[in-house]
Amino acid sequence: MTAPADKGKKAKTDADGGAAEENEQIDGALVLSIEKLQEIQDELEKVNEEASDKVLEVEQKYSEIRRPVYLRRSDIIQTIPDFWLTAFLSHPLLSELLTEEDQKMFKYLESVDVDDSKDVKSGYSITLTFSENPYFEDKELTKTYAFADDGTTTINATCIKWKEGMEIANGNAKKKGSKRPLVEESFFTWFTDTEHKSLADGVQDEVAEIIKEDLWPNPLKYFNNEAEELGEDDDEEGSDADEGEEDEEEEN
């Protein structure tokens, strides 16, 4: 009488064994697919690395071609009074960094120069050149950025040699016209805060990025206030569109 029960147990055991074997086959196939996928991703990574190297080669080539053009541009800019002061003040972000005292100093700013390292991926420098002025001894204020393979950025900046009585303590200037002077941060803290500093991977110097990637390529558009004018045109177009929609609604 126990035979049917034994057969049932055997059938269940066989079924469990079959399911386990099937699961092993599925797991094996999944592992194999993932391994093949990883191989393809590794291959893509190599292609991407090659592409990055090629892009850097092209960028290096054209950086060298652009250099003499930038120098010619700089010569012309120096014939235009207050060019860089006007360009900075017209920039929506950089203008916020210039105090009234900074603006007086910027009237002596002759040139701004952004120069990539010979190997463009290893860093760049930003140099502000000033004419003789009553504020500091330096002819040039330079900030350099060196990119390491581990992703860190090392920053060095000119230690400003202020003339007697002209130093802005800690890079801060006091606002005038207030019983209790308000302290506003000077643009020149950009130099004093990072005379020797390292930034971790992914951390950027926002001011340097704006100067290098936005202002430097075409400062003329800010000198001419083109950026502001474009924004005004967009606002006007938006207003015209809104008025058109209102007219259509009234007609309906």
Curated annotation (Swiss-Prot):
GO terms for biological process: double-strand break repair via homologous recombination; nucleosome assembly. GO terms for molecular function: histone binding. Its main location: nucleus. The keyword Cytoplasm applies. Residues 26-67 form a coiled coil. It holds the Pfam family NAP. Residues 1-15 have a biased composition (Basic and acidic residues). Residues 1-23, 222-252 are annotated as: Disordered. GO terms for cellular component: cytoplasm; nucleus. It is found in: Nucleus; Cytoplasm. It comes from the Eukaryota. Residues 226-252 have a biased composition (Acidic residues). InterPro entries: NAP-like_sf, NAP_family. Keywords: Chaperone, Coiled coil, Cytoplasm, Nucleus. Acts as a histone H2A/H2B chaperone in nucleosome assembly. Belongs to the nucleosome assembly protein (NAP) family. The acidic domain is probably involved in the interaction with histones. This is NAP1-related protein 2. It comes from Oryza sativa subsp. indica (Rice).
